[in-house]
From Swiss-Prot:
It comes from the Bacteria. The gene is trpB. Its EC number is 4.2.1.20. PANTHER family: TRYPTOPHAN SYNTHASE, TRYPTOPHAN SYNTHASE-RELATED. The beta subunit is responsible for the synthesis of L-tryptophan from indole and L-serine. Disulfide bonds: none annotated. Signal peptide: none annotated. This is Tryptophan synthase beta chain. Residues 408-447 are annotated as: Disordered. The lineage of its organism: Bacteria, Pseudomonadati, Pseudomonadota, Betaproteobacteria, Burkholderiales.
Protein backbone atom coordinates (compact mmCIF):
# COMPACT_ATOMS: atom_id res chain seq x y z
CA UNK A 1 0.00 0.00 0.00
CA UNK A 2 1.20 3.50 -0.86
CA UNK A 3 1.87 5.49 2.33
CA UNK A 4 0.31 8.93 1.85
CA UNK A 5 -0.43 11.66 4.37
CA UNK A 6 -0.96 15.04 2.72
CA UNK A 7 -1.07 17.96 3.24
CA UNK A 8 1.19 18.78 6.17
CA UNK A 9 -0.20 20.95 9.03
CA UNK A 10 0.65 24.14 7.12
CA UNK A 11 -1.30 23.06 4.06
CA UNK A 12 1.68 22.09 1.91
CA UNK A 13 1.81 19.16 -0.50
CA UNK A 14 5.58 18.97 -0.75
CA UNK A 15 6.60 22.35 -2.16
CA UNK A 16 3.06 23.10 -3.36
CA UNK A 17 -0.01 24.53 -1.68
CA UNK A 18 0.31 26.83 1.32
CA UNK A 19 -1.56 30.07 1.89
CA UNK A 20 -0.48 33.16 -0.03
CA UNK A 21 -3.09 35.79 0.82
CA UNK A 22 -3.23 39.49 1.60
CA UNK A 23 -3.18 40.66 5.18
CA UNK A 24 -6.86 41.62 4.89
CA UNK A 25 -7.78 37.95 4.32
CA UNK A 26 -5.50 36.41 6.94
CA UNK A 27 -8.13 36.53 9.67
CA UNK A 28 -10.81 35.03 7.40
CA UNK A 29 -8.50 32.19 6.34
CA UNK A 30 -7.53 31.45 9.94
CA UNK A 31 -11.20 31.51 10.95
CA UNK A 32 -11.98 29.02 8.17
CA UNK A 33 -9.08 26.73 9.14
CA UNK A 34 -10.24 26.66 12.74
CA UNK A 35 -13.85 25.95 11.77
CA UNK A 36 -12.92 23.12 9.41
CA UNK A 37 -10.58 21.59 11.99
CA UNK A 38 -13.46 21.68 14.48
CA UNK A 39 -16.08 20.08 12.23
CA UNK A 40 -14.25 17.84 9.74
CA UNK A 41 -14.43 14.83 12.09
CA UNK A 42 -17.47 15.92 14.09
CA UNK A 43 -20.02 13.04 14.11
CA UNK A 44 -23.04 15.36 13.96
CA UNK A 45 -21.58 17.38 11.06
CA UNK A 46 -20.65 14.23 9.12
CA UNK A 47 -24.05 12.63 9.74
CA UNK A 48 -25.81 15.72 8.36
CA UNK A 49 -23.42 15.86 5.39
CA UNK A 50 -24.02 12.23 4.40
CA UNK A 51 -27.76 12.61 4.94
CA UNK A 52 -27.80 15.55 2.53
CA UNK A 53 -25.79 13.55 0.00
CA UNK A 54 -28.23 10.66 0.22
CA UNK A 55 -31.56 12.48 0.33
CA UNK A 56 -30.87 15.76 -1.52
CA UNK A 57 -28.19 14.74 -4.03
CA UNK A 58 -29.25 11.13 -4.55
CA UNK A 59 -26.00 9.38 -3.65
CA UNK A 60 -24.46 6.95 -4.09
CA UNK A 61 -24.13 7.63 -7.80
CA UNK A 62 -24.08 4.40 -9.83
CA UNK A 63 -21.29 2.81 -11.82
CA UNK A 64 -22.23 1.86 -15.37
CA UNK A 65 -20.48 -0.65 -17.63
CA UNK A 66 -20.18 0.96 -21.07
CA UNK A 67 -20.44 -2.46 -22.70
CA UNK A 68 -21.09 -1.39 -26.29
CA UNK A 69 -18.27 1.15 -26.20
CA UNK A 70 -15.96 -1.46 -24.70
CA UNK A 71 -16.78 -3.98 -27.45
CA UNK A 72 -16.34 -1.47 -30.26
CA UNK A 73 -13.08 -0.01 -28.93
CA UNK A 74 -11.58 -3.38 -28.05
CA UNK A 75 -9.27 -4.06 -25.15
CA UNK A 76 -10.13 -3.06 -21.60
CA UNK A 77 -13.65 -2.84 -20.20
CA UNK A 78 -14.75 0.77 -19.63
CA UNK A 79 -16.84 1.73 -16.61
CA UNK A 80 -18.36 5.14 -15.88
CA UNK A 81 -18.88 6.68 -12.43
CA UNK A 82 -22.13 8.53 -13.08
CA UNK A 83 -21.67 11.87 -11.30
CA UNK A 84 -23.81 13.33 -14.08
CA UNK A 85 -26.82 11.74 -12.38
CA UNK A 86 -26.43 13.79 -9.20
CA UNK A 87 -28.94 16.54 -8.41
CA UNK A 88 -27.81 19.61 -10.42
CA UNK A 89 -26.03 17.35 -12.93
CA UNK A 90 -22.42 17.17 -11.76
CA UNK A 91 -20.02 16.40 -8.92
CA UNK A 92 -19.95 20.03 -7.76
CA UNK A 93 -22.90 19.66 -5.37
CA UNK A 94 -20.86 17.33 -3.10
CA UNK A 95 -18.55 20.19 -2.18
CA UNK A 96 -21.07 23.03 -2.02
CA UNK A 97 -23.17 21.17 0.54
CA UNK A 98 -20.16 20.67 2.83
CA UNK A 99 -18.99 24.27 2.58
CA UNK A 100 -22.50 25.72 2.99
CA UNK A 101 -22.97 23.63 6.13
CA UNK A 102 -19.69 25.05 7.42
CA UNK A 103 -20.75 28.60 6.53
CA UNK A 104 -23.95 28.28 8.54
CA UNK A 105 -22.05 27.03 11.58
CA UNK A 106 -19.71 30.02 11.25
CA UNK A 107 -22.67 32.43 11.22
CA UNK A 108 -22.14 33.62 7.63
CA UNK A 109 -25.25 34.81 5.78
CA UNK A 110 -23.84 35.66 2.35
CA UNK A 111 -22.20 33.20 -0.06
CA UNK A 112 -20.00 34.05 -3.04
CA UNK A 113 -18.60 31.69 -5.65
CA UNK A 114 -16.74 31.63 -8.95
CA UNK A 115 -17.76 29.43 -11.86
CA UNK A 116 -16.50 28.50 -15.31
CA UNK A 117 -18.83 25.93 -16.86
CA UNK A 118 -21.57 27.12 -14.54
CA UNK A 119 -21.99 23.81 -12.71
CA UNK A 120 -20.35 25.07 -9.52
CA UNK A 121 -22.45 28.21 -9.74
CA UNK A 122 -25.63 26.17 -10.12
CA UNK A 123 -24.64 23.88 -7.24
CA UNK A 124 -23.87 26.89 -5.03
CA UNK A 125 -27.13 28.64 -5.95
CA UNK A 126 -29.00 25.40 -5.27
CA UNK A 127 -27.69 24.90 -1.76
CA UNK A 128 -28.13 28.61 -0.96
CA UNK A 129 -31.78 28.32 -1.97
CA UNK A 130 -32.14 25.28 0.28
CA UNK A 131 -30.49 27.00 3.26
CA UNK A 132 -31.88 30.51 2.71
CA UNK A 133 -28.52 32.19 2.09
CA UNK A 134 -27.78 35.16 -0.16
CA UNK A 135 -25.81 34.02 -3.22
CA UNK A 136 -23.55 35.96 -5.62
CA UNK A 137 -21.76 34.11 -8.43
CA UNK A 138 -18.90 35.56 -10.49
CA UNK A 139 -18.55 34.26 -14.04
CA UNK A 140 -16.33 35.39 -16.92
CA UNK A 141 -18.38 37.05 -19.63
CA UNK A 142 -17.02 34.65 -22.28
CA UNK A 143 -18.25 31.76 -20.15
CA UNK A 144 -21.61 33.50 -19.70
CA UNK A 145 -22.00 33.30 -23.50
CA UNK A 146 -20.80 29.69 -23.70
CA UNK A 147 -22.91 28.44 -20.79
CA UNK A 148 -26.09 30.52 -20.97
CA UNK A 149 -28.42 27.68 -19.83
CA UNK A 150 -26.55 27.48 -16.53
CA UNK A 151 -26.66 31.27 -16.13
CA UNK A 152 -30.44 31.14 -16.33
CA UNK A 153 -30.57 28.20 -13.92
CA UNK A 154 -28.58 30.21 -11.36
CA UNK A 155 -30.94 33.15 -11.70
CA UNK A 156 -33.98 30.87 -11.36
CA UNK A 157 -32.48 29.63 -8.10
CA UNK A 158 -32.24 33.19 -6.78
CA UNK A 159 -28.54 33.90 -7.32
CA UNK A 160 -27.07 37.17 -8.56
CA UNK A 161 -24.76 36.41 -11.50
CA UNK A 162 -21.98 38.96 -12.07
CA UNK A 163 -20.32 38.79 -15.53
CA UNK A 164 -16.59 39.54 -15.31
CA UNK A 165 -15.21 41.65 -18.16
CA UNK A 166 -11.56 41.83 -17.10
CA UNK A 167 -8.65 39.80 -18.47
CA UNK A 168 -9.55 36.80 -20.58
CA UNK A 169 -13.12 36.96 -19.21
CA UNK A 170 -12.99 33.31 -18.08
CA UNK A 171 -12.62 31.28 -14.87
CA UNK A 172 -9.32 32.83 -13.75
CA UNK A 173 -10.82 36.30 -13.85
CA UNK A 174 -14.02 35.20 -12.11
CA UNK A 175 -11.90 33.83 -9.27
CA UNK A 176 -9.99 37.12 -9.05
CA UNK A 177 -13.23 39.10 -8.71
CA UNK A 178 -14.63 36.71 -6.12
CA UNK A 179 -11.46 37.16 -4.05
CA UNK A 180 -11.89 40.96 -4.23
CA UNK A 181 -15.48 40.64 -3.06
CA UNK A 182 -14.38 38.48 -0.13
CA UNK A 183 -11.82 41.09 0.95
CA UNK A 184 -14.49 43.80 0.90
CA UNK A 185 -17.18 41.78 2.71
CA UNK A 186 -15.23 39.42 4.90
CA UNK A 187 -17.36 39.76 8.05
CA UNK A 188 -20.61 38.27 6.72
CA UNK A 189 -19.40 36.45 3.59
CA UNK A 190 -18.24 32.88 3.01
CA UNK A 191 -16.41 32.09 -0.23
CA UNK A 192 -17.29 28.63 -1.59
CA UNK A 193 -14.37 27.81 -3.89
CA UNK A 194 -15.35 25.16 -6.40
CA UNK A 195 -12.07 23.40 -6.99
CA UNK A 196 -9.06 22.00 -5.13
CA UNK A 197 -7.15 25.28 -5.47
CA UNK A 198 -6.90 28.47 -3.45
CA UNK A 199 -5.20 29.04 -0.10
CA UNK A 200 -5.12 26.35 2.59
CA UNK A 201 -7.49 24.84 3.76
CA UNK A 202 -9.46 24.95 0.48
CA UNK A 203 -7.48 22.30 -1.49
CA UNK A 204 -7.75 19.84 1.41
CA UNK A 205 -11.34 20.74 2.29
CA UNK A 206 -12.71 20.46 -1.25
CA UNK A 207 -10.83 17.18 -1.75
CA UNK A 208 -12.29 15.79 1.46
CA UNK A 209 -15.87 16.67 0.50
CA UNK A 210 -15.40 15.27 -3.02
CA UNK A 211 -13.67 12.07 -1.88
CA UNK A 212 -17.10 10.50 -1.42
CA UNK A 213 -16.78 9.73 -5.15
CA UNK A 214 -13.73 7.48 -4.83
CA UNK A 215 -14.89 5.99 -1.54
CA UNK A 216 -18.07 4.79 -3.23
CA UNK A 217 -16.07 3.40 -6.16
CA UNK A 218 -13.89 1.30 -3.85
CA UNK A 219 -17.06 -0.42 -2.61
CA UNK A 220 -18.81 -0.60 -6.00
CA UNK A 221 -16.13 -1.81 -8.43
CA UNK A 222 -15.62 -5.30 -6.92
CA UNK A 223 -19.27 -6.00 -7.76
CA UNK A 224 -18.36 -5.62 -11.45
CA UNK A 225 -14.83 -7.02 -11.69
CA UNK A 226 -14.46 -9.40 -8.76
CA UNK A 227 -12.48 -8.85 -5.61
CA UNK A 228 -10.20 -6.18 -7.04
CA UNK A 229 -10.02 -2.58 -8.19
CA UNK A 230 -9.73 -1.10 -11.72
CA UNK A 231 -6.41 -1.08 -13.51
CA UNK A 232 -6.79 2.63 -14.27
CA UNK A 233 -8.91 5.53 -13.00
CA UNK A 234 -9.32 8.47 -15.38
CA UNK A 235 -10.73 11.95 -14.78
CA UNK A 236 -10.57 15.33 -16.50
CA UNK A 237 -8.47 18.02 -14.81
CA UNK A 238 -9.03 21.77 -14.86
CA UNK A 239 -8.64 22.92 -11.29
CA UNK A 240 -9.00 19.26 -10.48
CA UNK A 241 -11.80 18.68 -7.95
CA UNK A 242 -13.56 15.79 -9.65
CA UNK A 243 -10.20 14.12 -10.27
CA UNK A 244 -9.04 14.49 -6.66
CA UNK A 245 -12.44 13.28 -5.52
CA UNK A 246 -11.96 9.96 -7.26
CA UNK A 247 -8.13 9.79 -7.01
CA UNK A 248 -7.73 10.40 -3.28
CA UNK A 249 -9.20 7.12 -1.97
CA UNK A 250 -7.24 5.25 -4.66
CA UNK A 251 -3.81 6.75 -3.89
CA UNK A 252 -3.04 3.93 -1.47
CA UNK A 253 -3.91 1.32 -4.13
CA UNK A 254 -0.66 1.23 -6.07
CA UNK A 255 -2.00 -1.32 -8.55
CA UNK A 256 -4.40 1.32 -9.93
CA UNK A 257 -3.03 3.92 -12.33
CA UNK A 258 -4.35 7.45 -11.76
CA UNK A 259 -4.60 9.44 -14.99
CA UNK A 260 -5.66 13.08 -15.19
CA UNK A 261 -6.70 14.47 -18.57
CA UNK A 262 -6.00 18.13 -19.27
CA UNK A 263 -7.41 20.28 -22.07
CA UNK A 264 -4.91 20.27 -24.93
CA UNK A 265 -7.13 22.71 -26.84
CA UNK A 266 -5.80 23.17 -30.36
CA UNK A 267 -2.67 21.15 -29.48
CA UNK A 268 0.02 21.37 -26.83
CA UNK A 269 2.42 23.01 -29.29
CA UNK A 270 -0.14 25.60 -30.44
CA UNK A 271 -0.06 27.67 -27.27
CA UNK A 272 -3.87 27.48 -27.23
CA UNK A 273 -4.50 25.00 -24.44
CA UNK A 274 -5.02 24.74 -20.67
CA UNK A 275 -2.48 22.03 -19.85
CA UNK A 276 -0.84 23.46 -16.72
CA UNK A 277 0.75 20.21 -15.58
CA UNK A 278 2.28 19.47 -18.98
CA UNK A 279 3.34 22.96 -20.05
CA UNK A 280 3.33 25.01 -16.84
CA UNK A 281 6.00 25.88 -14.29
CA UNK A 282 5.78 26.19 -10.50
CA UNK A 283 4.39 29.55 -9.42
CA UNK A 284 1.83 31.16 -7.13
CA UNK A 285 -1.75 31.59 -8.34
CA UNK A 286 -4.90 32.34 -6.36
CA UNK A 287 -3.33 31.81 -2.97
CA UNK A 288 -1.37 28.61 -3.53
CA UNK A 289 1.85 27.38 -5.13
CA UNK A 290 1.26 25.03 -8.05
CA UNK A 291 1.96 24.54 -11.75
CA UNK A 292 0.95 27.67 -13.66
CA UNK A 293 0.92 28.53 -17.36
CA UNK A 294 3.20 31.57 -17.49
CA UNK A 295 5.60 33.40 -19.78
CA UNK A 296 9.33 34.03 -19.28
CA UNK A 297 8.52 37.05 -17.09
CA UNK A 298 6.33 34.98 -14.78
CA UNK A 299 3.09 36.51 -16.06
CA UNK A 300 0.08 34.19 -16.31
CA UNK A 301 -0.66 33.40 -19.96
CA UNK A 302 -4.02 33.15 -21.70
CA UNK A 303 -5.59 29.72 -21.98
CA UNK A 304 -7.97 27.99 -24.34
CA UNK A 305 -10.34 25.04 -24.20
CA UNK A 306 -13.62 24.19 -25.84
CA UNK A 307 -14.68 23.35 -22.29
CA UNK A 308 -15.26 26.33 -19.99
CA UNK A 309 -14.68 24.19 -16.91
CA UNK A 310 -11.14 23.26 -17.99
CA UNK A 311 -10.17 26.74 -19.21
CA UNK A 312 -7.88 27.64 -16.29
CA UNK A 313 -4.11 28.45 -16.19
CA UNK A 314 -3.41 26.61 -12.92
CA UNK A 315 -4.27 23.36 -11.17
CA UNK A 316 -4.81 22.18 -7.62
CA UNK A 317 -1.53 21.83 -5.66
CA UNK A 318 -2.17 18.19 -4.76
CA UNK A 319 -2.19 17.32 -8.46
CA UNK A 320 1.17 19.08 -8.80
CA UNK A 321 2.52 16.97 -5.94
CA UNK A 322 1.11 13.70 -7.32
CA UNK A 323 2.71 14.47 -10.67
CA UNK A 324 6.12 15.15 -9.13
CA UNK A 325 6.16 11.98 -7.02
CA UNK A 326 4.96 9.89 -9.96
CA UNK A 327 1.76 8.60 -8.35
CA UNK A 328 -0.46 10.18 -11.01
CA UNK A 329 0.01 10.70 -14.75
CA UNK A 330 -1.29 13.67 -16.72
CA UNK A 331 -2.09 13.66 -20.44
CA UNK A 332 -3.80 15.97 -22.92
CA UNK A 333 -6.88 15.66 -25.14
CA UNK A 334 -7.61 18.20 -27.87
CA UNK A 335 -10.89 20.00 -28.54
CA UNK A 336 -11.51 17.82 -31.60
CA UNK A 337 -10.85 14.58 -29.71
CA UNK A 338 -13.19 15.64 -26.90
CA UNK A 339 -15.94 16.49 -29.40
CA UNK A 340 -15.56 13.13 -31.10
CA UNK A 341 -15.84 11.36 -27.73
CA UNK A 342 -18.90 13.47 -26.85
CA UNK A 343 -20.70 12.29 -30.00
CA UNK A 344 -19.46 8.72 -29.67
CA UNK A 345 -20.78 8.32 -26.12
CA UNK A 346 -24.13 9.78 -27.19
CA UNK A 347 -24.50 7.34 -30.06
CA UNK A 348 -23.15 4.18 -28.41
CA UNK A 349 -24.38 4.45 -24.81
CA UNK A 350 -27.16 7.05 -24.90
CA UNK A 351 -25.31 9.34 -22.49
CA UNK A 352 -24.83 13.07 -23.13
CA UNK A 353 -21.72 13.93 -21.12
CA UNK A 354 -20.28 17.35 -20.37
CA UNK A 355 -17.46 18.51 -22.62
CA UNK A 356 -15.20 18.44 -19.56
CA UNK A 357 -16.01 14.78 -18.93
CA UNK A 358 -15.68 14.02 -22.65
CA UNK A 359 -11.95 14.71 -22.37
CA UNK A 360 -11.68 11.82 -19.90
CA UNK A 361 -13.85 9.58 -22.08
CA UNK A 362 -11.66 10.34 -25.10
CA UNK A 363 -8.50 9.25 -23.31
CA UNK A 364 -10.21 6.11 -21.98
CA UNK A 365 -11.05 5.17 -25.57
CA UNK A 366 -7.38 5.55 -26.52
CA UNK A 367 -6.04 3.67 -23.51
CA UNK A 368 -8.50 0.77 -23.69
CA UNK A 369 -7.11 -0.34 -27.05
CA UNK A 370 -3.67 -0.85 -25.49
CA UNK A 371 -4.98 -3.10 -22.71
CA UNK A 372 -6.35 -6.65 -22.39
CA UNK A 373 -10.06 -7.47 -22.34
CA UNK A 374 -9.78 -8.76 -18.76
CA UNK A 375 -8.52 -5.36 -17.59
CA UNK A 376 -10.72 -2.43 -16.61
CA UNK A 377 -10.81 1.37 -16.76
CA UNK A 378 -12.98 3.53 -14.49
CA UNK A 379 -13.85 6.99 -15.85
CA UNK A 380 -15.27 9.71 -13.62
CA UNK A 381 -18.13 11.07 -15.72
CA UNK A 382 -18.13 14.34 -13.81
CA UNK A 383 -21.17 16.02 -15.35
CA UNK A 384 -23.94 15.94 -17.92
CA UNK A 385 -23.83 17.81 -21.20
CA UNK A 386 -27.13 19.68 -21.32
CA UNK A 387 -25.21 22.93 -20.80
CA UNK A 388 -23.02 22.20 -23.85
CA UNK A 389 -25.69 21.34 -26.43
CA UNK A 390 -25.63 24.81 -28.02
CA UNK A 391 -21.82 24.83 -28.23
CA UNK A 392 -21.71 21.34 -29.73
CA UNK A 393 -24.45 22.14 -32.24
CA UNK A 394 -22.54 25.22 -33.42
CA UNK A 395 -19.25 23.32 -33.67
CA UNK A 396 -20.94 20.48 -35.55
CA UNK A 397 -22.60 22.77 -38.08
CA UNK A 398 -25.98 21.47 -36.93
CA UNK A 399 -29.33 23.11 -37.65
CA UNK A 400 -30.23 24.34 -34.19
CA UNK A 401 -33.43 26.10 -35.33
CA UNK A 402 -35.30 22.90 -34.53
CA UNK A 403 -35.38 23.94 -30.88
CA UNK A 404 -38.97 23.95 -29.54
CA UNK A 405 -38.69 27.67 -28.75
CA UNK A 406 -37.96 28.43 -32.42
CA UNK A 407 -40.48 26.13 -34.13
CA UNK A 408 -43.23 28.71 -34.11
CA UNK A 409 -40.98 31.09 -36.05
CA UNK A 410 -39.90 28.44 -38.52
CA UNK A 411 -43.33 27.04 -39.44
CA UNK A 412 -45.73 28.95 -41.67
CA UNK A 413 -49.06 27.55 -42.82
CA UNK A 414 -48.38 24.24 -41.08
CA UNK A 415 -45.45 23.44 -43.38
CA UNK A 416 -41.86 23.01 -42.19
CA UNK A 417 -39.50 24.86 -44.57
CA UNK A 418 -36.76 22.74 -46.09
CA UNK A 419 -33.98 24.85 -44.56
CA UNK A 420 -35.27 23.95 -41.07
CA UNK A 421 -35.74 20.23 -41.70
CA UNK A 422 -32.70 19.21 -43.74
CA UNK A 423 -29.74 20.59 -41.81
CA UNK A 424 -26.51 18.62 -41.48
CA UNK A 425 -26.56 15.72 -39.00
CA UNK A 426 -25.78 16.57 -35.39
CA UNK A 427 -22.80 14.24 -35.31
CA UNK A 428 -21.02 15.72 -38.34
CA UNK A 429 -17.68 17.27 -37.39
CA UNK A 430 -15.32 19.40 -39.41
CA UNK A 431 -11.95 17.73 -40.05
CA UNK A 432 -9.24 18.33 -37.46
CA UNK A 433 -7.98 21.86 -37.98
CA UNK A 434 -10.80 22.56 -40.42
CA UNK A 435 -12.29 26.02 -40.86
CA UNK A 436 -15.51 25.15 -39.03
CA UNK A 437 -13.62 24.11 -35.93
CA UNK A 438 -11.31 27.11 -36.05
CA UNK A 439 -14.19 29.54 -36.46
CA UNK A 440 -16.33 27.97 -33.77
CA UNK A 441 -13.57 27.83 -31.18
CA UNK A 442 -12.68 31.47 -31.68
CA UNK A 443 -15.09 32.34 -28.85
CA UNK A 444 -12.68 30.71 -26.42
CA UNK A 445 -9.49 31.58 -28.25
CA UNK A 446 -7.21 34.22 -26.85
CA UNK A 447 -5.96 37.14 -28.92
Amino acid sequence: MFDYHQPDPTGHFGIYGGSFVSETLTHAINELKDAYAKYQNDPEFLAEFHSELAHFVGRPSPIYHAARMSREQGGAQIYLKREDLNHTGAHKINNTIGQAMLARRMGKTRIIAETGAGQHGVATATICARYGLECVVYMGSEDVKRQSPNVYRMKLLGATVVPVESGSKTLKDALNEAMRDWVANVDNTFYIIGTVAGPHPYPMMVRDFQSVIGTECLAQMPEFIGNRQPDAVIACVGGGSNAMGIFYPYIAHEETRLIGVEAAGEGLESGKHSASLQRGLPGVLHGNRTYVLQNDDGQVTETHSISAGLDYPGVGPEHAFLKDIGRAEYVGITDTEALEAFHYLCRTEGIIAALESSHAVAYAMKLAKTMRSDQSILVNLSGRGDKDIGTVADLSGADFYDRPSMRGLAVKGGEQPKEFSDGPPLGKLAPSGGSAVREATSVGARK
